[in-house]
Amino acid sequence: MRKFEAIMQKIVGKEKVLGGTTTQASNILGPGHIKNHAALPSWIGEYDGGVSERVNMISETFSAYGLEMIAADDVKKRKWMKLFALTAIGPLSAIFDLNHTELYIDNKNQSISRNLGKEIILETRKVALAEGIEVSEDECLFMFNKIVDSKQT
């Protein structure tokens, strides 16, 4: 467990701390105009692992109101899943001064940028494996592929 989760648990009690992650991908085109690029689910679970009644209740409530949320038995792995996509999108967007749409979707050289993004993710996977997070290549590429292959709405 990272230090900040331990601090939160110490302050409010372990029973009050859940883990979770969400990924929303969009661009603001102008006042009142937003392009959504990824309808990805959010994940929630007991921080130390497992799905409890409260996790199921929260997941079902959010999903009922239009934000898909999945009860996760291994929320630490889900956090890594998000990190995989972020390692490929954030740094390359900054280096090339392009948002993720310009870099991976509307780019005539998107096959080059996508391959570079995938290589970054596979390198990040090595770190996850060293940290004891078991994740396949397909799993670590899942969120990245959902974002870069998504239809813009």
Model-derived features: positions:
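Rossmann-like NAD(P)(H) cofactor-binding subdomain of soluble oxidoreductases
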Residues: M1-H33
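Internal alpha-helical scaffold of NAD(P)-dependent oxidoreductase catalytic cores
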Residues: I11-K16, P31, K35-S136
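Alpha-helix initiation and N-capping motif
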Residues: E5, I89, E137-L141
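Short, solvent-exposed loop/turn elements at beta->coil junctions and helix N-caps
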Residues: Q24, D74-K77, F144-N145
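C-terminal active-site/capping subdomain that shapes the small-molecule cofactor and substrate pocket
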Residues: A128-T153
